[in-house]
Amino acid sequence: MSTASETQYAFHGAVEVDDQLDALETMLDPGTAECLVRLGVPAGARCWEVGAGGGSIARHLLALAGPGGRVVATDLDTSRIAAPGAEILQHDVRWDPAPDGGPFDVIHARWVLMHLPERRRVLSKLVDALAPGGWLVIEESMVTPEGLPVLTSSSPADVELFGRFSRAVVRILADAGADPQWGARDLHAAMAESSLEDVHSIHRTDSWTGGGAGSRLHDIHTRQLREPLCARGFTDSDLDRLQNIVADPRFSAMWYPLVSTCGRKTSRA
Protein backbone atom coordinates (compact mmCIF):
# COMPACT_ATOMS: atom_id res chain seq x y z
CA MET A 1 0.00 0.00 0.00
CA SER A 2 1.48 3.31 -1.04
CA THR A 3 1.64 5.87 1.74
CA ALA A 4 1.77 9.11 -0.26
CA SER A 5 0.61 10.41 -3.59
CA GLU A 6 0.37 13.45 -5.82
CA THR A 7 -3.22 12.37 -6.53
CA GLN A 8 -6.09 12.92 -4.12
CA TYR A 9 -5.29 9.88 -1.99
CA ALA A 10 -8.08 9.78 0.56
CA PHE A 11 -6.19 8.37 3.54
CA HIS A 12 -3.58 10.68 5.04
CA GLY A 13 -2.07 11.94 8.28
CA ALA A 14 1.33 10.76 9.53
CA VAL A 15 0.20 9.23 12.81
CA GLU A 16 -2.90 7.73 11.23
CA VAL A 17 -0.91 6.18 8.36
CA ASP A 18 1.46 4.46 10.79
CA ASP A 19 -1.50 2.98 12.65
CA GLN A 20 -3.25 2.14 9.39
CA LEU A 21 -0.28 0.23 7.99
CA ASP A 22 0.05 -1.77 11.19
CA ALA A 23 -3.64 -2.67 11.22
CA LEU A 24 -3.64 -3.55 7.51
CA GLU A 25 -0.67 -5.86 7.99
CA THR A 26 -2.53 -7.62 10.80
CA MET A 27 -5.68 -7.99 8.70
CA LEU A 28 -4.25 -8.74 5.26
CA ASP A 29 -0.76 -10.24 5.55
CA PRO A 30 -1.87 -13.81 6.36
CA GLY A 31 -3.86 -14.02 3.12
CA THR A 32 -1.09 -12.43 1.07
CA ALA A 33 1.53 -14.76 2.55
CA GLU A 34 -0.65 -17.78 1.78
CA CYS A 35 -1.09 -16.61 -1.81
CA LEU A 36 2.66 -16.17 -2.36
CA VAL A 37 3.46 -19.55 -0.83
CA ARG A 38 0.90 -21.22 -3.11
CA LEU A 39 2.55 -19.67 -6.16
CA GLY A 40 5.86 -21.20 -5.15
CA VAL A 41 8.28 -18.26 -5.19
CA PRO A 42 11.53 -19.91 -6.28
CA ALA A 43 14.81 -19.65 -4.41
CA GLY A 44 16.88 -16.86 -5.92
CA ALA A 45 13.81 -15.04 -7.26
CA ARG A 46 14.00 -11.39 -8.29
CA CYS A 47 11.02 -9.67 -6.67
CA TRP A 48 9.48 -6.21 -6.83
CA GLU A 49 7.14 -5.09 -4.05
CA VAL A 50 5.12 -2.10 -5.30
CA GLY A 51 3.77 0.29 -2.66
CA ALA A 52 5.73 -1.46 0.07
CA GLY A 53 4.22 0.53 2.96
CA GLY A 54 5.75 -0.80 6.17
CA GLY A 55 7.75 -3.51 4.40
CA SER A 56 6.04 -6.61 5.79
CA ILE A 57 5.50 -8.30 2.43
CA ALA A 58 8.98 -7.31 1.25
CA ARG A 59 10.29 -9.16 4.30
CA HIS A 60 8.17 -12.17 3.40
CA LEU A 61 9.49 -12.15 -0.16
CA LEU A 62 13.04 -11.99 1.17
CA ALA A 63 12.38 -15.11 3.23
CA LEU A 64 10.87 -16.96 0.26
CA ALA A 65 13.56 -15.94 -2.23
CA GLY A 66 16.37 -16.86 0.15
CA PRO A 67 20.00 -15.69 0.25
CA GLY A 68 20.36 -15.70 -3.53
CA GLY A 69 17.21 -13.70 -4.12
CA ARG A 70 16.70 -10.02 -4.64
CA VAL A 71 13.81 -7.86 -3.45
CA VAL A 72 13.24 -4.28 -4.57
CA ALA A 73 10.74 -2.45 -2.33
CA THR A 74 9.34 0.79 -3.75
CA ASP A 75 6.96 3.48 -2.54
CA LEU A 76 6.45 7.20 -2.84
CA ASP A 77 7.35 7.50 0.85
CA THR A 78 10.06 5.02 1.84
CA SER A 79 10.45 6.23 5.43
CA ARG A 80 8.28 3.44 6.83
CA ILE A 81 9.72 0.50 4.89
CA ALA A 82 11.40 -1.88 7.33
CA ALA A 83 12.88 -4.66 5.22
CA PRO A 84 16.58 -5.35 5.97
CA GLY A 85 18.18 -6.89 2.92
CA ALA A 86 15.78 -5.33 0.43
CA GLU A 87 16.73 -2.56 -1.98
CA ILE A 88 14.52 0.37 -0.98
CA LEU A 89 13.71 2.91 -3.66
CA GLN A 90 11.52 6.01 -3.77
CA HIS A 91 9.45 5.44 -6.88
CA ASP A 92 6.21 6.56 -8.52
CA VAL A 93 4.84 3.53 -10.34
CA ARG A 94 2.65 5.78 -12.49
CA TRP A 95 5.47 7.69 -14.17
CA ASP A 96 8.85 6.18 -13.29
CA PRO A 97 10.36 3.32 -15.31
CA ALA A 98 10.58 -0.08 -13.69
CA PRO A 99 13.44 -0.17 -11.17
CA ASP A 100 16.77 -1.79 -11.90
CA GLY A 101 17.03 -5.43 -10.92
CA GLY A 102 14.56 -6.87 -13.40
CA PRO A 103 13.08 -8.48 -15.23
CA PHE A 104 11.31 -9.80 -12.17
CA ASP A 105 10.14 -13.29 -11.27
CA VAL A 106 7.50 -11.94 -8.87
CA ILE A 107 5.81 -8.53 -8.77
CA HIS A 108 3.31 -7.85 -5.99
CA ALA A 109 1.10 -4.83 -5.30
CA ARG A 110 -1.64 -4.59 -2.67
CA TRP A 111 -4.15 -1.76 -2.35
CA VAL A 112 -2.24 0.29 -4.95
CA LEU A 113 -3.84 0.18 -8.40
CA MET A 114 -7.40 0.76 -7.18
CA HIS A 115 -6.29 4.21 -5.97
CA LEU A 116 -4.69 5.22 -9.30
CA PRO A 117 -6.72 6.64 -12.19
CA GLU A 118 -3.87 5.40 -14.41
CA ARG A 119 -4.35 1.81 -13.17
CA ARG A 120 -4.56 0.14 -16.60
CA ARG A 121 -1.38 1.79 -17.85
CA VAL A 122 0.38 0.85 -14.61
CA LEU A 123 -0.80 -2.74 -15.02
CA SER A 124 0.78 -2.86 -18.49
CA LYS A 125 4.03 -1.51 -17.06
CA LEU A 126 4.10 -4.23 -14.41
CA VAL A 127 3.46 -6.94 -16.99
CA ASP A 128 6.31 -5.59 -19.12
CA ALA A 129 8.64 -5.75 -16.10
CA LEU A 130 8.09 -9.49 -15.61
CA ALA A 131 10.57 -12.11 -16.69
CA PRO A 132 9.20 -14.93 -18.87
CA GLY A 133 7.37 -17.27 -16.51
CA GLY A 134 7.22 -14.58 -13.81
CA TRP A 135 4.14 -14.01 -11.66
CA LEU A 136 2.20 -10.78 -11.21
CA VAL A 137 0.10 -10.67 -8.03
CA ILE A 138 -2.33 -7.77 -7.66
CA GLU A 139 -4.42 -7.61 -4.49
CA GLU A 140 -7.37 -5.30 -4.02
CA SER A 141 -10.33 -5.31 -1.69
CA MET A 142 -13.84 -5.85 -2.99
CA VAL A 143 -15.50 -2.62 -1.90
CA THR A 144 -19.18 -2.38 -2.82
CA PRO A 145 -21.43 0.69 -2.63
CA GLU A 146 -23.60 -1.13 -0.07
CA GLY A 147 -20.82 -0.98 2.53
CA LEU A 148 -20.03 -3.68 5.08
CA PRO A 149 -22.63 -6.08 6.50
CA VAL A 150 -23.04 -5.82 10.26
CA LEU A 151 -23.21 -9.16 12.07
CA THR A 152 -23.85 -8.17 15.69
CA SER A 153 -24.59 -4.89 17.42
CA SER A 154 -26.00 -3.54 20.66
CA SER A 155 -28.64 -1.42 18.89
CA PRO A 156 -30.33 -0.87 15.50
CA ALA A 157 -29.20 2.77 15.64
CA ASP A 158 -25.57 1.63 15.69
CA VAL A 159 -26.20 -0.58 12.64
CA GLU A 160 -27.75 2.36 10.78
CA LEU A 161 -24.93 4.77 11.64
CA PHE A 162 -22.16 2.32 10.76
CA GLY A 163 -23.88 1.43 7.48
CA ARG A 164 -24.15 5.11 6.55
CA PHE A 165 -20.47 5.56 7.44
CA SER A 166 -19.20 2.58 5.43
CA ARG A 167 -21.20 3.65 2.38
CA ALA A 168 -19.84 7.19 2.68
CA VAL A 169 -16.26 5.88 2.76
CA VAL A 170 -16.84 4.15 -0.59
CA ARG A 171 -18.09 7.41 -2.12
CA ILE A 172 -15.15 9.36 -0.70
CA LEU A 173 -12.71 6.89 -2.27
CA ALA A 174 -14.42 7.23 -5.64
CA ASP A 175 -14.39 11.02 -5.41
CA ALA A 176 -10.61 10.88 -4.82
CA GLY A 177 -10.06 8.98 -8.08
CA ALA A 178 -10.10 5.43 -6.74
CA ASP A 179 -12.16 2.64 -8.28
CA PRO A 180 -13.43 0.72 -5.24
CA GLN A 181 -14.77 -2.13 -7.42
CA TRP A 182 -11.70 -2.50 -9.64
CA GLY A 183 -10.48 -5.65 -7.89
CA ALA A 184 -13.80 -7.44 -8.10
CA ARG A 185 -15.08 -6.19 -11.46
CA ASP A 186 -12.30 -5.39 -13.92
CA LEU A 187 -8.90 -6.57 -12.70
CA HIS A 188 -9.20 -10.25 -13.62
CA ALA A 189 -10.33 -9.42 -17.16
CA ALA A 190 -7.61 -6.79 -17.58
CA MET A 191 -4.92 -9.30 -16.59
CA ALA A 192 -6.42 -12.02 -18.81
CA GLU A 193 -6.36 -9.61 -21.77
CA SER A 194 -2.67 -8.87 -21.26
CA SER A 195 0.21 -11.22 -22.05
CA LEU A 196 -0.45 -13.32 -18.95
CA GLU A 197 -1.58 -16.91 -18.64
CA ASP A 198 -2.94 -19.01 -15.76
CA VAL A 199 -4.86 -15.96 -14.53
CA HIS A 200 -6.86 -16.79 -11.43
CA SER A 201 -8.40 -14.94 -8.50
CA ILE A 202 -8.66 -15.94 -4.86
CA HIS A 203 -11.23 -14.26 -2.62
CA ARG A 204 -10.75 -14.18 1.15
CA THR A 205 -12.89 -12.53 3.76
CA ASP A 206 -13.01 -12.34 7.53
CA SER A 207 -15.23 -10.84 10.14
CA TRP A 208 -13.91 -8.43 12.73
CA THR A 209 -15.02 -7.62 16.25
CA GLY A 210 -14.96 -4.31 18.07
CA GLY A 211 -11.55 -3.66 19.59
CA GLY A 212 -9.61 -5.71 17.00
CA ALA A 213 -7.59 -4.79 13.90
CA GLY A 214 -10.69 -4.12 11.80
CA SER A 215 -11.95 -1.85 14.55
CA ARG A 216 -8.68 0.07 14.51
CA LEU A 217 -8.94 0.71 10.78
CA HIS A 218 -12.44 2.14 11.05
CA ASP A 219 -11.43 4.28 14.00
CA ILE A 220 -8.51 5.60 11.93
CA HIS A 221 -10.84 6.34 9.01
CA THR A 222 -13.09 8.49 11.19
CA ARG A 223 -10.02 10.66 11.82
CA GLN A 224 -8.44 10.57 8.35
CA LEU A 225 -11.73 11.28 6.58
CA ARG A 226 -13.27 13.64 9.11
CA GLU A 227 -13.51 16.61 6.74
CA PRO A 228 -15.16 14.78 3.80
CA LEU A 229 -17.42 12.86 6.19
CA CYS A 230 -18.61 16.11 7.77
CA ALA A 231 -19.19 17.48 4.27
CA ARG A 232 -21.54 14.53 3.75
CA GLY A 233 -23.61 15.35 6.80
CA PHE A 234 -21.83 13.54 9.62
CA THR A 235 -21.60 15.52 12.85
CA ASP A 236 -18.81 15.46 15.41
CA SER A 237 -21.22 13.55 17.63
CA ASP A 238 -21.75 10.94 14.88
CA LEU A 239 -18.02 10.40 14.47
CA ASP A 240 -17.44 10.19 18.20
CA ARG A 241 -20.25 7.62 18.39
CA LEU A 242 -18.70 5.64 15.52
CA GLN A 243 -15.41 5.42 17.41
CA ASN A 244 -17.30 3.97 20.36
CA ILE A 245 -19.25 1.56 18.16
CA VAL A 246 -16.19 0.03 16.49
CA ALA A 247 -14.45 -0.35 19.87
CA ASP A 248 -17.42 -2.20 21.38
CA PRO A 249 -16.76 -5.99 21.59
CA ARG A 250 -20.50 -6.54 21.09
CA PHE A 251 -20.17 -5.10 17.57
CA SER A 252 -18.96 -7.23 14.65
CA ALA A 253 -19.05 -6.89 10.88
CA MET A 254 -17.56 -8.43 7.77
CA TRP A 255 -14.34 -7.04 6.35
CA TYR A 256 -13.88 -6.16 2.70
CA PRO A 257 -13.03 -9.38 0.80
CA LEU A 258 -9.41 -9.39 -0.36
CA VAL A 259 -9.17 -10.39 -4.02
CA SER A 260 -5.75 -11.76 -4.99
CA THR A 261 -5.47 -11.96 -8.78
CA CYS A 262 -2.42 -13.76 -10.15
CA GLY A 263 -1.14 -14.22 -13.67
CA ARG A 264 2.04 -15.62 -15.18
CA LYS A 265 3.88 -14.12 -18.12
CA THR A 266 4.11 -16.54 -20.96
CA SER A 267 7.46 -18.32 -21.16
CA ARG A 268 7.07 -19.04 -24.86
CA ALA A 269 9.49 -17.32 -27.18
How would you name each of these model-derived features?
Residues 194, 258-269:
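Core SAM-dependent methyltransferase catalytic element
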Residues 105-120:
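A short SAM/SAH-binding and catalytic strip from SAM-dependent methyltransferases
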Residues 120-135:
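A short glycine-rich, Lys/Arg-flanked "PGG" loop and its adjoining helix->strand segment in the class I
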Residues 97-107:
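A short acidic, Gly/Pro-enriched loop at the edge of an enzyme's catalytic core
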Residues 26-43:
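Conserved alpha-helix/loop element of class I SAM-dependent methyltransferases that forms part
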Residues 48, 52-98:
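Class I SAM-dependent methyltransferase SAM/SAH-binding core
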Residues 137-212:
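Conserved catalytic/acceptor-binding region of the Class I
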Residues 10, 14-17, 28, 198-254:
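C-terminal helical/coil "lid" or tail adjacent to the Rossmann-like core of SAM-dependent
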